[in-house]
Design a protein with these regions (language model features):
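Aromatic-rich peripheral "rim/lid" segments of glycoside hydrolase catalytic domains that contact
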Residues: 143-195
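Generic hydrophobic, helix-prone segments enriched in Leu/Val/Ile
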Residues: 53, 113, 191-195
Length: 195
């Protein structure tokens, strides 16, 4: 048996986008069981805990944690407004198939996002738990300029609140990398890093 040294930077993400049928109570119970199992062999390992209902940020308040368990980063996903981020995706009821939806970054477009992220920040501060926006992004059916404005605004808001974040995705419908051309979407990367 070969031993491998595992860095402290390896985090365990317990469940990604837990199924809605599990519900908050079922998810909290499952988290507690998984944490107990993991702590037997990894007492100091940082854990990433997702929120109920497919990882939605509005369900943060439904999470419960085992007593004295603080080495946790809470993760929520954020894809609002859905009509923009998921436009023209046939599998999404709110996708407005056949319509191009732009995001101009107006005060009216920003206000609900700011309200949602303010809620997340209050929860994080009141619970003394760090928050990671584990997924956010825009499908490639959106126009590039709208994507750039959205990415810059979102990154600015996450930084302002001290949230870590991960863009979705590397490839595919939301991807920053084109597998056929083997090129990165430089405009999106600029928007994500130079806000």
């Amino acid at each position: 048996i070969r031993r491998v040294k595992i860095t402290r930077m390896l985090f365990f993400d317990l469940l990604n986008e837990p199924n809605m049928r599990l519900g908050a109570d079922g998810l909290n119970k499952l988290h507690a069981e998984l944490i107990a199992i993991i702590r037997r062999t990894n007492p100091g390992r940082t854990l990433i805990i997702g929120t109920p209902n497919l990882g939605q940020t509005w369900t943060l308040g439904e999470l419960k944690f085992p007593e004295n368990e603080w080495n946790i980063i809470v993760q929520g996903h954020y894809y609002l407004p859905h009509t923009f981020t998921h436009q023209n995706l046939e599998y999404v009821p709110s996708a407005m198939v056949g319509h191009q939806v732009e995001w101009h970054g107006t005060e009216n477009e920003k206000a609900p996002i700011i309200r949602d992220l303010d809620f997340c920040q209050r929860w994080s501060e009141q619970s003394s738990r760090p928050l990671n926006i584990g997924e956010y992004g825009v499908c490639l059916k959106a126009d590039q300029q709208s994507m750039n404005r959205y990415f810059s605004f979102m990154q600015e808001q996450f930084q302002l609140r001290g949230f870590s974040s991960h863009i979705w995705a590397y490839r595919g419908l939301f991807g920053l990398y084109d597998l056929q051309t083997k090129k990165w979407n430089q405009e999106s990367i600029q928007a994500l890093t130079n806000f």
